[in-house]
Every structure is written in C-alpha cells, then in structure tokens.
A protein has these predicted regions:
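CE4/NodB-like, metal-dependent polysaccharide N-deacetylase domain
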Residues: 98-140, 195-210
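N-terminal catalytic cores of secreted or lumenal carbohydrate-active enzymes
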Residues: 1-95, 99, 107-111, 140, ...
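The substrate-binding groove and active-site-proximal loops of carbohydrate-active enzymes
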Residues: 10-27, 49-58, 81-98, 114-126, ...
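Acidic, His- and aromatic-enriched active-site or binding-groove loops in soluble protein domains
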Residues: 63-82, 132-155, 160-171
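C-terminal (or distal) subdomains of carbohydrate-active enzymes
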Residues: 131-134, 158, 174, 183-185, ...
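Metal- or metallocofactor-binding catalytic centers and their adjacent structured scaffolds
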Residues: 253-368, 378, 740-753
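C-terminal domain-boundary segment and adjacent tail
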Residues: 8, 46-57, 61, 136, ...
C-alpha cells in the first residue's frame, strides 16, 4: 500500500479516573460532534471504539438523535462493534468474552448497523492464545491491537498470522505506536500532513500504513478531510478515510505465523499488577460468571425445553451488568475509588438477579408452589440439584426459608406464615440422617426477630444425577452434638489434613503428602494499581500466634479452624525504599473442611487487613522442584514456565506472575482459586496465589518495575483494602479441570413441591468423562432451542458423547456466534456424538 488509511476514532473508557456519568457527559458532546461532521462531510467516517455499548450510553441522554445515528450506521460511515464492551482480555472467562461478542453484534444489528468484522482491542493488558479461535467463531478475520508482544514481535513485524492452539488463525495487525499515532493533529492541515508524512517515512514500507486519528475521550478532529488531501499530495499516493474494515487484504501465505499468548512488554506496558488489584472486584466477577454460566444459563435452557417460561430477558440483564464491569479499567481495578464502588454495586445487582433467577428455575423444576406458600406440615421435601454433566457427591448448603417447623403466624390469619428464627437451637435430619445446622451468612435473609440469624443446613448429598436432582425429606429432630476439641488431624476416605504448629497444613492424598501448605508471604509494595513494586530490607510477616480448633459433626463433615496472627509493617515509607518500622497485627483465619465421598479439601480464608502498601500471598509447596506448572486459561489449559523471561530491552519488565482462570497445578497438587487470578510457580515447586495487593495510588512514577507512566497520579485509598476479605479455595490431587469446576460450582438445594416439571433422579444431560469439559449450556440467542458447547483442553482429538434426558428433534453444529458451521454431529435417539479437535471447541444447537 503506497498510500495510507486514516481512521478517525476515540478510545472510550466508560469509567476510569472519572466515573461513568462523568465520562458519559463528555461522550454526549463527542458523539454530537461526530454526527455533525458526518452530516457536513460526505467523506468522513468514525469508529466508535469497537464497542456498541457506546450507542446505548449516548442514546440514553440523547434519544432524539437515534435516527441520525442509525442513518450513519446503515450507511457504513459510523463503525461499531464487534464487542458490546471493550473488555479486558485475560480476566473474563472465555464464555464471558463470547457473550460480549454475541451481545455486541446483536445490538449493532438492532440499531441498523453492520458490526465490524475486525477484532479491535486497542488497549487491553495482554491477550490469550485462544483469541484466534474465539474470533474465528464469529467470522472475524483480523485482530488489531497494541499491547502484549514479547520478543516474538522482532521476527513477526507489524502484520502476521496468529494461530490458536486448535489451528484457527487470523491476521494480526500490531499498532506499533499505539492507537493514537495520528492523534492531536496541528490545526494547520499542511503542518498536520507534514507531520504524518514524516512519520510514515520513518516507519518504512514494511509497517502497516494505518493512521489512527484519535485518543482517549477526545473530541474528533474536524479538519481530517483537508489533512488527507494535503497528505496525499505530499505522498503522491491515495490517502483514504474510512474504518478498520477498509484495511486492504493481506495475502496470508506470505505472513509469518505465531502461536501462543500475547503477555509480554517488549514494546508497550503490559501492567500485570492489575491481576491482583482490588481483590473484591475479582472475586465478585468470578462469582457472577459462575452463577450465570454454571447455573442460570443451563437451567434456563433445560427448563425452557421442559415447558417452563423464557428467562432470556433476565439472563441478558444480568450479563449486561457483568459485561459493563469487564471493561479493563473496571475489572482490573485501576480506577478511582468511586468507580470501584460502582463496579461492586453492579456485581451485587447481577448476583442478586442471577441467584433469584436460579432459585425460581430450580423451584419450578422441583414443583414448588409458585406462590411459595409454606405448608402446615412438620416435614419438608428439598431438592438438591447438580449443575454438572456427571454424577456428583458433594457438600450442599440449604437455606431454611421457608421451613414450617420454624414458622409462626405474624399478623392477621389471612396473611401468609413467615419464617422467623427459632427460639431454641433446633436439630434437623435428612432422610433420618443428621445434618449440620449453621447460621446463615447471607445478610439479605429475612429476619423477624433480632435474637438469632436465619439458619441453613449442611450435609453430603450422594450420587446426584447429571443435570438432575435428588429429593430428600428434611425433618425436625434433636440437635446432635458436634465434637469440638483442639485436635489437629482430620481423616476420611484416604484423605488426611493435619494442622502444623505454625498453622500451615499437611495434606495427604493417599500416599502422596504435601507439607507447609497455606504458608504466608507478605511483601511491601511501593507500586500502584498497575504494577507491584517490591521494596528493600523487607522483614515480611512474623508469626505471632496460632490457635487451632477441630470440629467433627455426626453428618461426617469435619473442619479445622486455624487462626494465625502475624506482625507486619504498617505501611511503606514515603520514599518507597523500605517498609515502616511500626508494626501492626494482621489476622488470617483458615477453615479446612473434608467430607466423606468428596476427594478434596475445601478452604475458606478470612483476612482482616490492617496494613497498607503490601502484597499477601498464600504459598503451596508441592514438595519437589518444578520447571513449569499447568493452569487454566481462556478456553484451554496452558503450561506456565518457572524460568525467568528474557526481557532485555523491554519497555516493561516481564513479571514472574501469570494470570489463571481458576486453578494451578504442579507435581500432582492442584490449587483451585477462583477469583484470585494472579499466581506464580517457582523453580523449587511452590505455587503462590495472591490473596491481596494493597496500594494507595492509581499510578505513580519512579517504579523499579515500570519505567513508563501508566495513568494519572491520583490517590485511591480504597485500593488499600483495609478490613475483611474472604476467599474460597480447594486442594485436589492431579490437574483435572472438571474436578476443579465441580469444586467451584458445588450443588444447590431448594424446597420441593408436588407438581415437578422434572422427576427426581432423572439426568437431563450427561457427558462422558474422557477429558472433555462442558463449556456452555445456554438458551440460543434467537430463542430457537439451546446450545451445548464442549471444550477439549488436551493434545488429542476426542469424541464428545452427550446423552440427553429429553426428546430431541434436531441437532446442528454451529459456530460461537450460533450460526451453522457445516460441521458434522451424529444424532441417535437421545445420544449426540461429535469430534472435538485438540484444544478445540464444538458448539451444537439442540432443538426439542
């Protein structure tokens, strides 16, 4: 290309160092100007940052401009999509990224536009290796990006073929100088053209001749037409004004090929500290994804197939709140405190909507009265549901609300009975077996008396069928005593847990024993929301005291409660050279639980953070050296090296940490840590999981770990995360993604009724356990059936063998965008089979 393409655009962070509403006021001004320029200049085009949410945000305050906006979209002069929200690339789940593209393309079409076929990700902090497979599943053939390259970019150049582990490939175009190489042009068209001509000459003919005319939250330049004319005269070649879709096609055969992630800092800041900034946001995000992907979507799909109502509107509403939060400055936590508070508020809303939707879905299937009247009986039927495509035995916790034996009449007789707290300590049994009664930890549970919390019951539900439920009878009984002593050992079914004198755990899976688990590392952090920055002369955490309590219940549930108090420095000195001499006590409480029939250790970690400017990690020694570990990543399992990266000459030094999607495994020990996405594997075989990284600045200068600026220098005291923090982890033997997902999703129980849509002990969907994972079970976006998606994270081709408990009318192989892909899938009665390539995804539309 002798000439060049000028793309006028802005990059629009919906919230960052201003709140969403603060930026939306500026968005209204910016899009007003864009529409004026489109009307005045027939050659003008503008890219709305590749995210369709901008349309919603703008029209919410400018509804009278919808016709003008739709006219520009239909004419192809205003570019939007394919994303709904420009996301962070590494922290959302693969399914969340898929919903993002589904919603983005849907919204673009609703406004009359054609979503861009370019996967534009200008500013996210690195990218997963499976992006090419994701984008190919939506018919996107080009990836335009800035951050993430390591040393491979020296050989690849500005344009190359990026190949996913399954073999899918797209053309990648690297914005070497960012998405702003033609921003802030001089007012004089000739001067602006001269600057751009000099820039192009310096880049040479091998670089993509793409000029990105825009920057963060900037009003568009109004004289781009005159600049393009002047530049064409200087170059003696055509200068086009258009969108990224107007980029000329590049011959794939002549391009170098790259396979792997993009998580390097060779040419641009990677900013990996965001993987651990503001832990509550990460935990809330993962909880929402698990509720929607693991519970709400599957049961909405199956419930609809069984004749229940359509819950798609509720799912979309919840997903949109989650996706709003997956913009990189929101999910990454690198924003001001007001934004972080609003992000958590959206997650609370999404959690509430998801939980209520799930409860209603399960209650309908189990036949509970839609009016939820409490029958005047002394026993209650409960239904325990399994969200997995294989039988499960696991611990389940059921809320006693409503429960007749605990209900009293409040008010007039014509009003319903209400559940209130018991005046004495009740006991309960499930099918005659004792259950553990515990106070509810849910602050939203209704209370009618101030004397006691509402109650839950906990027990082990055995052999719950795949995507089905098991029915139990809950009855009142004498409350059995729980053994409470100072013992330090738990043991069941060949699984042993021992609390050491220092509060760490010894865990034995059969003959394989691991020592020193849950050791604590606490280091000073002089960095900011973007990067960890270690300080010198760090005393770390000094263990001050340890107490241990053992509780063993007749139900078979066994727990160790270990409380450790550490002395840590209060903060980092203002010069950031060392931590303060003044210390402060920091308390960490760990509950380790085992249960019969459940081959794992469940961990609940509660920290009350009292210190500032530090990173606290939980360490899991695996007992042997390690050159690498395995970790969950976007739509795959990936190997992570323990060796340092050669980062000589990099703009941003390579971190020793890495992001993960739920679990990390080395030397036979798997640490499941959903919502704690930062980990490290050391050469001596220690897995480290970051529990908290407390910082007080959005960005700072003078870091050892980063030479270039990253954002505005603003205090964010909320990111110090003072106060309580709770996280749930688990320990497993091996590296089984399915078992890790089971630990995360658990089981759920609801009150059962007399008119179930589904009979108990009926499996609705099962997947043969041969290494495949169920990635999605969801209603089809167009309402025509539902979609089953299977992931193969292994190096071998596998056959998916899916058995349904409902009659099937038709089966069709589809892409990720749920359009037919021409793939084959056999359908023999209730059994569907299809091949899944190594590291590949297969999606099937099921009609009933």
């Amino acid at each position: 290309m002798d000439g060049c393409l000028i793309v006028s655009h802005f990059h629009w962070d919906r919230e960052w160092y201003r709140t969403f509403e603060g930026y939306r006021a500026r968005l209204a001004d910016a899009v007003d100007r864009v529409l004026e320029l489109l009307e005045a200049d027939p050659g003008y085009h503008f890219l709305l940052d590749g995210q369709t949410v901008v349309l919603e945000d703008y029209l919410a305050v400018r509804p009278q401009r919808r016709a003008a906006l739709e006219t520009a979209l239909r004419a192809g002069r205003l570019g939007t999509g394919p994303w709904y929200v420009q996301p962070d690339s590494l922290l959302p789940s693969g399914e969340a990224l898929t919903r993002n593209l589904l919603y983005g393309m849907r919204l673009a079409a609703e406004y009359g536009g054609r979503p861009s076929r370019i996967a534009y990700v200008p500013d996210s902090f690195g990218h997963p290796a499976q992006f090419p497979q994701l984008f190919a599943g939506f018919g996107l053939d080009t990836f335009v990006y800035w951050r993430g390259n390591g040393n491979e970019i020296d050989a690849l150049g500005g344009t190359y073929r990026w190949q996913a582990p399954d073999g899918s490939a797209i053309t990648a175009l690297h914005l070497t100088d960012g998405y702003f190489n033609a921003a802030c042009l001089p007012d004089d068209p000739q001067g602006a053209a001269a600057r751009l001509a000099a820039y192009l000459a310096a880049k040479g003919s091998s670089a993509p001749r793409l000029l990105m005319n825009g920057f963060d939250h900037m009003l568009p330049d109004s004289h781009v037409g005159a600049v393009a004319t002047a530049l064409a005269a200087l170059l003696g070649a055509p200068v086009e004004r258009g969108l990224l879709d107007d980029l000329p096609a590049v011959g794939n055969g002549a391009l170098p090929v790259y396979r792997g992630e993009l998580i390097g800092g060779r040419l641009a800041n990677l900013l990996p500290g965001v993987w651990s900034t503001r832990t509550p946001i990460k935990l809330a995000n993962r909880a929402c994804e698990a509720l929607l992907e693991g519970w709400a979507e599957p049961w909405a799909a199956l419930g609809r197939a069984l004749g229940g109502p359509d819950e798609q509107p509720a799912l979309r509403l919840a997903w949109k709140r989650v996706l709003h939060n997956q913009a990189h400055d929101s999910l990454c936590g690198c924003s001001v405190d007001a934004v972080a508070n609003q992000v958590l508020g959206r997650y609370d809303s999404a959690v509430g909507l998801s939980r209520e939707t799930i409860t209603r879905l399960l209650e309908r299937l189990a036949g509970h009265d839609v009016e939820r009247r409490t029958p005047d009986v002394v026993e209650q039927e409960v239904a325990i549901f399994n969200p997995s495509p294989h039988p499960r035995t696991d611990v389940v916790r059921v809320a006693l609300e409503p429960y007749p034996a605990l209900s009293l009449q409040v008010g007039q007789p014509q009003f319903p009975r209400f559940t209130i707290a018991a005046l004495e300590e009740p006991g309960f049994a499930i099918d005659g077996r004792p259950v553990r009664v515990v106070p509810s930890a849910d602050p939203a549970r209704t209370r009618w008396l101030p004397i006691e919390s509402p109650l839950d019951v906990e027990f082990v539900a055995a052999d719950v069928p795949p995507f089905g439920y098991k029915r139990y009878t809950l009855s009142r009984t004498a409350r059995p005593a729980e053994e409470d002593d100072h013992g330090r050992t738990l043991e069941v079914d060949g699984l042993r847990v021992v609390a050491a004198e220092d509060g760490t755990l010894e865990v034995a899976f059969g003959d394989t024993v691991y020592h020193g688990l849950l050791d604590v590392e606490d280091l000073g952090d002089g960095g900011d929301s973007y990067d960890f920055d270690a300080v010198g002369n760090d005393p770390g955490a000094a263990l001050a005291s340890v107490t241990c309590r053992r509780l063993r219940h007749p139900s078979g549930l066994q727990r160790l409660e270990i409380s450790r108090i550490f002395e840590v420095p209060l903060a980092v000195h203002e010069d950031r050279e060392q931590r303060s001499e003044q210390g402060i006590a920091l308390r960490l409480v760990t509950e380790a639980r085992i249960a019969p029939g459940v081959p794992r250790v469940d961990l609940t970690v509660r920290l009350h953070n009292t210190a500032r400017d530090h990173r606290l990690r939980l360490r899991f020694p695996t007992g042997a050296p390690a050159t690498a570990c395995l970790a969950a990543t976007t739509f795959d399992v990936i190997g992570r090296s323990a060796a340092p990266t050669d980062d000589r000459g990099w703009v941003h030094p390579a971190p020793s940490t890495f992001p993960h999607q739920g679990w990390v495994s080395a030397n036979g020990l798997c640490v499941v840590a959903p919502g704690l996405p930062e980990a490290e594997i050391s050469s001596d075989g220690v897995i480290s999981i970051t529990l908290l990284r407390a910082v007080g600045w959005l960005a700072r200068y003078g870091l050892r770990s980063r030479a270039q600026p990253a954002g505005p220098v603003m205090p964010i005291d909320g990111a110090q995360q003072l106060g309580p923090l709770e996280a749930r982890l688990a320990l497993l033997a091996g590296a089984d993604p399915v078992a890790a997902r089971d630990a995360e999703l658990g089981l759920r129980g609801v009150i059962a009724g007399e008119r179930p849509l589904l009979a108990p002990d009926t499996p609705l969907l099962s997947l043969a356990r041969n290494g495949l994972q169920l990635s999605a079970l969801k209603p089809a976006e167009d309402g025509d059936g539902f979609v089953v998606r299977v992931l193969n994270p292994t190096d071998a081709a596998l056959e998916a063998d899916v058995t349904f408990g409902i009659a099937l009318a038709a089966v069709e192989s589809v892409r990720l965008d749920e359009t037919p892909d021409g793939g084959s899938a056999s359908h023999d009665g209730a059994v569907v089979r299809c091949d899944v390539p190594p590291h590949g995804l297969r999606s099937l539309r099921i009609r009933t």
